Amino acid sequence: MSDTVIIAGGGPVGLMLACELGLAGVDTVVLERHDAPREPSRGGAINATVVELFTQRGIMESLRDDGFEFRMAHFAHIPLAPERVPGDRAFSFAVPHAQVERRLEERARSLGVRVRRSTEITSVRQTPDGVQVTTGDGEVVEGAYLVGCDGSASLVREQAGIPFPGVDPDFHGLWGDIKVEPGAPVLERIGARQYELGLCMVAPIGPDTVRVITGEFDVPSPPADQEVGFDELRAAVARIAGVELDGVPGWLSRWTATSRQAERYREGRILLAGDAAHTLFPLGGQALGTGIEDAVNLGWKLAATVQGWAPPSLLDSYHEERHAAGARACASTRAQTTIMRSLARVGELRALLTELAGLEEVNAYLVRMVGGIDGSRLPDVPLVTAEGETSVYRLLEAGRGVLLDLGAGLPAVRHPQVTYVRAEPTNRLDATAVLLRPDGVVAWRAPQDGLEAALETWFGPAA
């Protein structure tokens, strides 16, 4: 049986998973139908959870010069204040998703991953001890496992027979990148705004280019594959925002606020991640953030399974943990789209929620939820060890488990999958010792009992 893991789809989620597997030393091949990252990028930012996960693996350093941090967030386009939230958490980062894809591909290749572009998958088959994938030119690629990161219309999910229930709400719109002249009327509408008939967002994405996104409810939606004309976008902007959109159109497209989730993330040796597992309206970067979390959660578990040291049911915990997270993300974005309806319908409700968002506890709750930092990962706190200064996330760069002793006086734990680190106590962490999984999730913390049980549950017997 081959020990290769096959990843269908070389977008950010598939490439992040490839990086995780490559870091663990697993033979990995990515099959991607496009010959290069798609331009222009549909997404222009990553949220706090992606920043933290990239920092855990040393990836953010390669992206720092490609974008900039911004301390803004929103819930259904109701402004929030991330800078008022206590704790050492990351902020969002503006960077085109195509550039994220390029950086991840560079890293994956440096870790020995084979990234095969212009390679389309046409069929998938499970065997008793592996998987077989047939490509467009008739080649059969064999592996131990297949992970479908091939988007909302996933062929892998379809051929694995995994249902994909959900809703197609009556909310849809247009978006386009438009080159405009200085002083163009549309520049007076910079930002995301709700209007009587819907929403219109205008965001600069270059020296003379803006991205324009419109959204309307209760209006018949043309077929998703129907070509968008500039006149259609101009008419929508005028109808909703009451402003003329003049300029030279570049990329134009249409979108819908579809929300769907796979019934299960695993079918034998086939697994799903990213949009193949859950499709949601990409508000505040939640869609990509949820997908990157899938990749980091799955990577070490799949590596442990392929390498033979995984405890029983470790791989099954991927569905248990990430399906619940995906359901929550879908619910969050559905709730937001509900209160993004026209002001004529929900104006009073939005006014009340805007007032509530001014309360510190409500602001903090919403910032953490939309940023994906409300879970069980630690912040990147500076640490001092006998070897010198480090931080929580630097300890995780190797992709191993970490037992961090912050004054608990634990005996040095010797486990082949866990690194023991003794650091000076810090009041920035509410624990005297923590056991971190390779994905940064806290598996145990002192003074609770159960360290040995947690080690065996997540990393197997020490010998």
From Swiss-Prot:
InterPro entries: FAD-bd, FAD/NAD-bd_sf, RIFMO-like. Keywords: Antibiotic biosynthesis, FAD, Flavoprotein, Isomerase. GO terms for molecular function: FAD binding; isomerase activity; oxidoreductase activity, acting on paired donors, with incorporation or reduction of molecular oxygen, NAD(P)H as one donor, and incorporation of one atom of oxygen. It catalyses: 4-[(2E,7S,8E,10E,13R,14R,16E,18E)-14-ethyl-7,13-dihydroxy-2,16,18-trimethylicosa-2,8,10,16,18-pentaenoyl]-2-methylidene-5-oxo-2,5-dihydro-1H-pyrrol-3-olate = 4-[(1R,2R,4aS,5S,8aR)-2-[(2R,3R,5E,7E)-3-ethyl-2-hydroxy-5,7-dimethylnona-5,7-dien-1-yl]-5-hydroxy-1-methyl-1,2,4a,5,6,7,8,8a-octahydronaphthalene-1-carbonyl]-2-methylidene-5-oxo-2,5-dihydro-1H-pyrrol-3-olate. FAD binds at residues 13, 32-33, 121, 275. Homodimer. Belongs to the PheA/TfdB FAD monooxygenase family. Involved in the biosynthesis of the spirotetramate antibiotics pyrroindomycins. Catalyzes the intramolecular cyclization forming the dialkyldecalin moiety in pyrroindomycins, via an endo-selective [4+2] cycloaddition reaction. This is Dialkyldecalin synthase. It comes from Streptomyces rugosporus.
